[in-house]
């Protein structure tokens, strides 16, 4: 099914230009596919055609990302509008999204190129305020912009007031993001097939404040009244903070587009949780 394969690497990461990566490119070429890479990449190989960004998105049927989850997030931001399926090969650390292992690449890629794969569509979250429009795969984080200092805000869902409170900030996480920053902040793990968001206060002043789950079709709004600095901050998927003036209302919604992730047919989310989070199959090992 896939005859024209694009590859994507973390920019300026010379550490990925190693024997393992070169061997995977050679294995890919043996599958009788055309291999392309965007000219903005620093990686070069005789078996890979270097093309412009416009040629890249026009030619490729699938993008294979070599790296960790952060690299896959970067590729999603660059190519989301073209709706090209993405396959992740884990050359990073945890790697919930990059589920192909380097030592299993040859077997996995042959199966996928023969049609033994499934495509999973992951929801994306958008945040709008003033003239800004941000989007991400993992989460929207709105915070005070100062370490261990609170801001006061009011939260709305579908035009109804949920609460007004003080906290370091608020995380709105997708199921994909539930195994990322939101997990570190005490949020629940959400199966990626569920169409929900997690709303998670960051170090709230009220001890009764807890994370809660809502439909991803809900309209979430947040109005910030005051904080320790001249502005509050918003950050999406760990990108650079953007200033939010006090009194501004931020609208958080599900995007119409989805990210299409390619997995082997035997991909198992719970196996990934066991492996990445150290869960045990034997209670005596816990």
Kindly give the residue locations of the regions a language model identified.
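ATP/NTP phosphate-donor binding region
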Residues: 1-62, 102-118, 129-134
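Gly/Ser/Thr-rich active-site loops/lids in small-molecule metabolic enzymes
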Residues: 164-167, 172-208
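Catalytic core of DAGKc-family lipid kinases
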Residues: 16, 94-168
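ATP/nucleoside-binding phosphotransfer catalytic cores, i.e., glycine-rich phosphate-binding loops
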Residues: 134, 142, 147, 158-161, ...
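Short glycine/serine/threonine-rich phosphate/pyrophosphate-binding segments
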Residues: 17, 71-75, 179-184
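Short glycine-rich anion-binding loops that position phosphate/pyrophosphate groups of nucleotides
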Residues: 69-71, 94, 176-178
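Gly/Ser-rich helix-loop-strand patches that form or flank binding pockets
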Residues: 79-89, 96
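Redox-cofactor binding/interface segments in oxidoreductases and associated redox assembly factors
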Residues: 7, 65, 172
